[in-house]
């Protein structure tokens, strides 16, 4: 795990979850919606701390340090677009969640990227692919599917073989 962020011109691919609400695609942990057909740009919210959930308990995340939005993400801060390095890591993270209307997928990350233990935090992000096992997402046309299709990326079935890695928490 690096303590510094690097700038990437070519995208890194990660895995993340979104929420479908009000006919839009929202971030899971932060109340902002993703804009179709253009890069989504990270900004620091200046919160005291973020919450992230391990497989068994809620833990405090990194402190957010207010700074200029153009410098997001800072390695010392908790801002940026989050993505897991692997789909199995994401699936384990989701294991204890019961929210409805979630969508799992791949995301392109580029610009300033902070390498974290299980994934990345990035300056820019855009969906690469949405996964769904649901007939509704794949074939029906309603507010949810229209919201996904506006991104002009594939909506595909979830890969059938997704191993479940064990998270290892560092004290």
Kindly label every feature range from the protein language model.
Residues 72-94:
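Extended catalytic/binding region for NAD+/ADP-ribose chemistry, centered on the ART fold
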Residues 67-73, 118:
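Short, flexible, solvent-exposed loop/turn segments with mixed acidic/basic and small polar residues
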Residues 1-61, 79, 91-171:
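Conserved NAD+-utilizing ADP-ribose enzyme module
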């Amino acid at each position: 795990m690096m303590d510094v962020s690097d700038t990437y011109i070519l995208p890194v691919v990660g895995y993340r979850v979104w929420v479908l609400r009000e006919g839009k695609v929202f971030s899971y942990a932060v109340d902002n919606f993703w804009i179709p057909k253009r890069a989504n740009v990270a900004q620091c919210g200046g919160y005291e701390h973020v919450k992230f959930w391990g497989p068994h308990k809620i833990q405090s995340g990194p402190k957010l340090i207010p700074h200029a939005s153009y410098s997001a993400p800072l390695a010392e801060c908790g801002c940026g677009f989050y993505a897991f390095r692997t789909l199995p890591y994401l699936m384990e993270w989701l294991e204890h969640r019961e929210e409805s209307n979630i969508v799992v997928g791949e995301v392109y990350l580029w610009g300033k990227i902070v390498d974290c233990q299980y994934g990345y935090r990035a300056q820019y992000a855009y969906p690469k692919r949405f996964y769904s096992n649901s007939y509704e997402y794949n074939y029906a046309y309603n507010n949810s599917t229209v919201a996904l299709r506006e991104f002009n990326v594939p909506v595909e079935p979830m890969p059938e073989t997704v191993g479940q890695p064990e998270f290892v928490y560092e004290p």
